[in-house]
Amino acid sequence: MATANFGKIQIGIYVEIKRSDGRIHQAMVTSLNEDNESVTVEWIENGDTKGKEIDLESIFSLNPDLVPDEDIEPSPELPPPSSSSKVNKIVKNRRTVAAVKNDPPPRDNRVVGSARARPSQLPEQSSSAQQNGSVSDISPVQAAKKEFGPPSRRKSNCVKEVEKLQEKREKRRLQQQELREKRAQDVDATNPNYEIMCMIRDFRGSLDYRPLTTADPIDEHRICVCVRKRPLNKKETQMKDLDVITIPSKDVVMVHEPKQKVDLTRYLENQTFRFDYAFDDSAPNEMVYRFTARPLVETIFERGMATCFAYGQTGSGKTHTMGGDFSGKNQDCSKGIYALAARDVFLMLKKPNYKKLELQVYATFFEIYSGKVFDLLNRKTKLRVLEDGKQQVQVVGLQEREVKCVEDVLKLIDIGNSCRTSGQTSANAHSSRSHAVFQIILRRKGKLHGKFSLIDLAGNERGADTSSADRQTRLEGAEINKSLLALKECIRALGRNKPHTPFRASKLTQVLRDSFIGENSRTCMIATISPGMASCENTLNTLRYANRVKELTVNPAAAGDVHPIMHHPPSQIDDLETQWGVGSSPQRDDLKLLCEQNEEEVSPQLFTFHEAVSQMVEMEEQVVEDHRAVFQESIRWIEDEKALLEMTEEVDYDVDSYATQLEAILEQKIDILTELRDKVKSFRAALQEEEQASKQINPKRPRAL
């Protein structure tokens, strides 16, 4: 009898069901549950099999063709019930209700005749029916069903599970709300980025901190790359900027970059970088020096070449690291790497094994600005960089000052820092626009014994200013961009022991050529980063650059990478090659090689721009040199012409001789000045070519190096 209640529903057939979100679709019947008069159905959604338990009433309401047929004959006194009433009675599965309705109910028990009686009234209905003797017309099964009446709709297991999940969800939401309220009390709610602040704090709470300490061992590296984080400065604190840099261990740096989804939901993208050493904002200069530059001091006493670079955005702490602590605008040079390295050099000189060498210590300090070299110890005199027949790079006119103690070094540093070129950029109001190179040179009987070069590089955000409307700004950005690319490739070549180093691609690497060549050369790079969220992009650029420098040194399998040669359309520069004779110069070859090795960072348009700038700088130097030679020649012409004029004052001077000599002087003047004029015209054409190339720059990655 119970199976008949399911009507035409069978296991394996498909029925229409209604989901909780209102969707109606088909599902397959997998079981019939007689105990609670329900069926279990399953369907496939998004590749997953899902199931649900549904009562018969819901099934029959959506699938009326599955309703069971009436198997009890209606009373002959009553007309056949209509199809609608039949369906309504069967839906409730109470087929005895029709017989009960046939007898008029007692007046004191009107509820019995109602097919929609509430469950609380059903016991009274049952007792009243028994008192009136109506039970004799009903079968025992029907009587039992009538005694309990139409039961309330029983909850399926799925519904119970959903209710449990909903209850847990509400409880969890309440806890989260309480937690948010508690956090709001702990943080400054007026900070527009307090949500990001809470995310960063929660993330840091899950980290295991093991920072670098002075007790950690110093590893031997031919190329050492480390990162130093500075604390938030006064301006950033006033602006309520957030610290988005975390250094959980001695060699790991994490950047919490704030991002925003399409629905304006904010979230963090945590990026991790690994280096040789990572210094947090509590590390003093002495600790940074101990792990970076100090191991290089002994190299120069072993007839080696050492270099230490400070790289990063302006204001990130490069000059603080290299020059010393600041107290307002005054700098304590005794706490910088310059002075610390000089101190150790003089201490090493006193050791017995080095004292017998009778070494002399010299120092130089110069800057490289827009591809030109200036002596900071000689009133910023412009210097020339030439390569001799032995392929040794010579900085003509650079003064070397002998130093006897650390105090002498500090005086030279003060003199040089006061002359260094600086200016305003898009990132900072006071940006170092030049590379400052301080060198400690050891000589033995006048011959070079070792050299330690300490370089405070220009702010790397300046390298993004290659499309500026101002030519001087463009040239600054182009030279910084090119020199940083060349520096990276030279360090890579040093780490891989490559046969060729593209040092001629920039003035910086050309001057430091001897530091990248030779078995006894060592390099250290200190990447300084700002912790503020406002500097996040520049910080990521600095970390990516430093990571690429070290990344390839530990991956020798990539040494055989071959990059296709870039082809560029002919330009006006190519037309000038024949006249100027610099088309196949070593500088241009190294520049092309440099751009080919960095195709992911240098677009063809940017390469054309760098090529135009290099060509223009070479032509500028040649025009200035020729102009200087013409000027010197003009002085001689004046003397010759003065002698001719004095000759004409004589009574019987030789007119033929006068005319011949004057004509010779004029022809010489015309030839030299015509040649200079042609070069000036070509130089102006190169200036226009550079301006056109700057307007077509479309770098593949719109960021500074």
Swiss-Prot record:
Residues 158-186 have a biased composition (Basic and acidic residues). Interacts with AURKA and PLK1. Interacts with PSRC1. Interacts with MCRS1; the interaction enhances recruitment of KIF2A to the minus ends of spindle microtubules which promotes chromosome alignment. ATP binds at G312, Q313, T314, G315, S316, G317, K318, T319. Residues 222-552 form the Kinesin motor domain. The modification Phosphothreonine is found at T96. The keyword Transport does not apply. Residues 1-216 are annotated as: Globular. The gene is Kif2a. GO terms for molecular function: ATP binding; microtubule binding; microtubule motor activity. Belongs to the TRAFAC class myosin-kinesin ATPase superfamily. Kinesin family. MCAK/KIF2 subfamily. It is found in: Cytoplasm; Cytoplasm, Cytoskeleton; Cytoplasm, Cytoskeleton, Microtubule organizing center, Centrosome; Cytoplasm, Cytoskeleton, Spindle pole. Plus end-directed microtubule-dependent motor required for normal brain development. May regulate microtubule dynamics during axonal growth. Required for normal progression through mitosis. Required for normal congress of chromosomes at the metaphase plate. Required for normal spindle dynamics during mitosis. Promotes spindle turnover. Implicated in formation of bipolar mitotic spindles. Has microtubule depolymerization activity. GO terms for biological process: cell differentiation; cell division; dendritic transport; mitotic spindle assembly; mitotic spindle organization; nervous system development. CDD domains: KISc_KIF2_like (cd01367). The modification N6-acetyllysine is found at K101. Keywords: Acetylation, ATP-binding, Cell cycle, Cell division, Coiled coil, Cytoplasm, Cytoskeleton, Developmental protein, Differentiation, Lysosome, Microtubule, Mitosis, Motor protein, Neurogenesis, Nucleotide-binding, Phosphoprotein. Residues 122-139 have a biased composition (Polar residues). Residues 659-698 form a coiled coil. One of its GO terms (cellular component) is microtubule. InterPro entries: KIF2A-like_N, Kinesin-like_fam, Kinesin_motor_CS, Kinesin_motor_dom, Kinesin_motor_dom_sf, P-loop_NTPase. Highest level in lung. High level in ovary, moderate levels in heart, kidney, placenta, skeletal muscle and spleen (at protein level). Pancreas and spleen express a shorter isoform (at protein level). Expressed in the flagellum of elongated spermatids and sperm in the testis lumen (at protein level). Isoform 1 expressed in neuronal cells. Isoform 2 expressed in astrocytes and fibroblasts. Its main location: cytoplasm. Disruption phenotype: Mice show overextension of collateral branches of developing axons and defects in neuronal migration in the brain. They die within 24 hours of birth. This is Kinesin-like protein KIF2A. The modification Phosphoserine is found at S75, S134, S139. Residues 65-186 are annotated as: Disordered.
